[in-house]
Amino acid sequence: MLAFNPLVTALAALIFLFCQANANPPLMQRLVHEYQWKTKQGLPRQGACTPHNLAVRREWSTLDVETRLEYIEAVKCLARLPSIIDPELAPGARSRFDDFQATHIRHTRTIHATGSFFAWHRHFVYLYEKALREECGYTGYQPYWEWSHWANLPITANPLYDGSNASLSGNGVYIPNRNGTLQLFPIPNPSPDTAIYTPPGTGGGYIYDGPLVDWELHLGPVLYSYDNGQYIPPNPRPDGLGYNPRPLIRDFNNTLLQQGASWDIILNMLVNVTDMHEFHPLFFQGPHLAGHIFISGVDNDIFTSPGDPLFWFHHAQVDRIWTIWQALDLETREYALDGTLTLLNCKNLPFRRILAGELTVCDDSTAQP
């Protein structure tokens, strides 16, 4: 079972240095260099963690094919290793990979749109990375996915999900004539009126190429999505933790990245958003959400999204952007939090209005005491 400190301190980010992808805008390059310099300046010259022995996370496209294949094999290894989570907590878990998804399912309502969102997922990615290295022999660190770099390029241009043997497999089979996906949000009394709508993308069915073509999900769904286009058998348990084997669905949609994670959006947040109470909701409903619904499939269920191995690249990038933002004013931002441990700190807030920018805080009538 995975153990968590409820609020992992922001200082934990300093053991990692994120190496940027090629061809980023000059402003982004300057911000990354400033973050890297400040990180190294803040470390002791001697000891267990120095500027000379930092762990470095890299963008997938900058890795050589040998390293990519090593990573893919480690992911498959986690999916082969038996689960160690308490079966009373997650009876459907069959593998070590499932253990991470089960943990995310169990904590979802306290780790999204809450004060613990960034720090909890930082530690979560670290534990997954640690399992890849210590249990499955991976010698690198968790790569990230630079959304903005790929948003305006053809989907197959990204070696992370181009369907090649050195990718994390590609898109799902294209299903035409769909109305999109409606995901109920986990607030009290959810309904289609308080749901997240995802327009149909370029897939919608099961993945059909690449090394994860036989990938099998065992947990979920928790939030059943309407008009998905591909039938998803319901889980035998209402909490989604029962055994429910099925293939992996994807529905890539670059338009969502262009609208939610473009360079303009990312750079505006890094340069102009200086307060955590503004940065958190803007980032959560913008780049964070855009990456998930670009992938779609299991990522259209906020509980079960770690069931797709692309989740870990997405959240490594989430952590990277937060890390850069922190480093630009570390004295103020290192321990800055926004929110409580109650999702949205609301009893029943229409989430669509938040996505549309109409609401960023709860009304007094909906706030938790």
From Swiss-Prot:
Cu cation A binds at residues 112, 121. PROSITE patterns: TYROSINASE_1, TYROSINASE_2. Glycans are attached at residues 165, 179, 253, 272. This is Tyrosinase-like protein orsC. Tyrosinase-like protein; part of the gene cluster that mediates the biosynthesis of orsellinic acid, as well as of the cathepsin K inhibitors F9775 A and F9775 B. The non-reducing polyketide synthase orsA produces orsellinic acid by condensing acetyl-CoA with 3 malonyl-CoA units. Further modifications by the decarboxylase orsB and the tyrosinase-like protein orsC lead to the production of F9775 A and F9775 B. The functions of orsD and orsE remain unclear since only orsB and orsC are required to convert orsellinic acid into F9775 A and F9775 B. It comes from Emericella nidulans (strain FGSC A4 / ATCC 38163 / CBS 112.46 / NRRL 194 / M139) (Aspergillus nidulans). GO terms for molecular function: metal ion binding; monooxygenase activity. The keyword RNA-binding does not apply. Induction: Expression is induced by an intimate physical interaction of the fungal mycelia with the bacterium Streptomyces hygroscopicus. Expression is repressed by VeA and MvlA via histone 3 acetylation by the SAGA/ADA complex. The gene is orsC. It comes from the Eukaryota.
